[in-house]
Amino acid sequence: MALFLARHTLSGTGAGCHGRGPAPDVSEVDLTLQALGERGFSRLLDLGLACLDLSYVEMREFVVWGRPPASEAAVASTPGSLFRSHSSAYWLSEVERPGGLVRWARSQTSPSSLTLAPHLGPSLLSLSVVTGGGCGAVAFCNAFFLAYFLVVRSVFPAFSDRIAAWICDRSPFCENTRAVARGYRGLVKRFLAFVFERSSYDPPLLRQNSRPVERCFAIKNYVPGLDSQSCVTVPSFSRWAQSHASELDPREIRDRVTPATAPSFVADHASALLASLQKKASDTPCGNPIQWMWYRLLVNSCLRSAHCLLPIPAVSEGGRKTGGGVGEELVGAGGPCLSRDVFVAIVSRNVLSCLLNVPAAGPRAYKCFRSHASRPVSGPDYPPLAVFCMDCGYCLNFGKQTGVGGRLNSFRPTLQFYPRDQKEKHVLTCHASGRVYCSNCGSAAVGCQRLAEPPSARSGWRPRIRAVLPHNAAYELDRGSRLLDAIIPCLGPDRTCMRPVVLRGVTVRQLLYLTLRTEARAVCSICQQRQAPEDARDEPHLFSSCLEVELPPGERCAGCRLYQTRYGTPAAQAHPPGEAGGGFSRQSPAS
């Protein structure tokens, strides 16, 4: 739809115009809208602001920042305001409320109010005829939208063509007050989405973030764009091979030109590749990737090998080398000694540990790993799981909920389990990548071990019982009288229970022979308070082992089969539970 007016003279009492009398000639506005230029849009903006009784500065502040002018400044700037009791700041604030625009328009166009400012009536009538927007409150709403759109055009002149197309195609913007009964934001959202080619754009145009610090922390949740300046420029091997295809054998190109058979210029290419990587790696913000790659390659190679020979980097306090290997040390570009880092990493992996293997010296080590619906052996909470850092050797799940129903996986933290620095060791999770890190050293090498494992070929067909220490100095236990605190699985008469139990003040010697007999401190509180069923012969107990429910030999778990081979029939089969020698009594069954 095109706006229409060509040297028009307005007069008369149009319907809904309340008989305001003859209007001044507005023929100076040349508005055959195909011929609208900058002067025509400026005249339209002046007419719209005159109808709204607002200045350009006030309207621009409202459109750009969404804030009305101060009440005092508005009253001073418009001495002949349409409403003597309310300033423009009041009505611009009223527009933000649901239905505020319609209330403002109706009050502005009421006959009793227009008599206070008779110069506004002709401006509104002129703009109504220009835009075809009707009279009364509807014309006032169209004047508000036209002024809003033209202010956006003056603020963003680069989008003037799209804004002009919107004004020409969509005028009048509302044909009745019901279209804007809920407010002006719906139409303005569609206008801004069309102009800026966005799926959604809420007014105002600019917004100030009231929490800039929190927004900086949330930047990691967004995927940043590729920065060409941060890319490492390296020679392309494929282009080099194509350019030297006539000089190389096809098999050498296929095998990526091994150094043994490569021509002399291959070494030049390798040198150029290394030089370009070193040039870019020296000032990379994330560190030196070349040194880190060498470090990971050397550490992984030594850890996977059965034996490795490491130079001892003996360095004095002054930084001068006083001993160690005969050859030169591996030093990265601008970085510290690489051999020292590799030495520390490998030695810490092989020395620092928080786990002890308790010898399976007695029947209490042979647990039943029978799985049923109420207690899946392969579940996340049974047997208890120890999460530890493979670099610093600390246990990371003291008092932490790990997995579904993680009460059996978390060890209650006590003062004994915060050694030296009294710092709680736990796992940090990256919300961007999902990787876990050690809170003590920042390593991503996190391992898991069950405190109880069934017999297998890997363990020499012997069960494994592990104890978790509060520190990472398991190799420091050099004598049998050394006192320590540890967490072990339950070693009570119930062979199916493996809940974690805290042992305090136990010696190394007592820990070595802990599986020979049942000790009260090695039994969990649930097993100590458990009552026997009334008749276990008719209905097997929920926590009965494979031998107690008399499963066929082929369906028994590895722990029960090995237990029967070594110790025969358990006492729970010979005596009913609850009686002397029974599996649920406080006495240990005969071995």
UniProtKB/Swiss-Prot annotation:
Keywords: Early protein. Residues 571-591 are annotated as: Disordered. Signal peptide: none annotated. One of its GO terms (cellular component) is viral tegument. Belongs to the Epstein-Barr virus BFRF2 family. Part of the viral pre-initiation complex (vPIC) that is responsible for the expression of vPIC-dependent late genes. vPIC is composed of at least BcRF1 that binds the viral TATT box, BDLF3.5, BDLF4, BFRF2, BGLF3, BGLF4 and BVLF1. InterPro entries: UL49 (IPR004339). Part of a trimeric complex composed of BGLF3, BFRF2 and BVLF1. Coiled coil: none annotated. GO terms for biological process: viral process. It holds the Pfam family Herpes_UL49_1. It comes from Epstein-Barr virus (strain B95-8) (HHV-4). This is Late gene expression regulator BFRF2. The keyword Cell cycle does not apply.
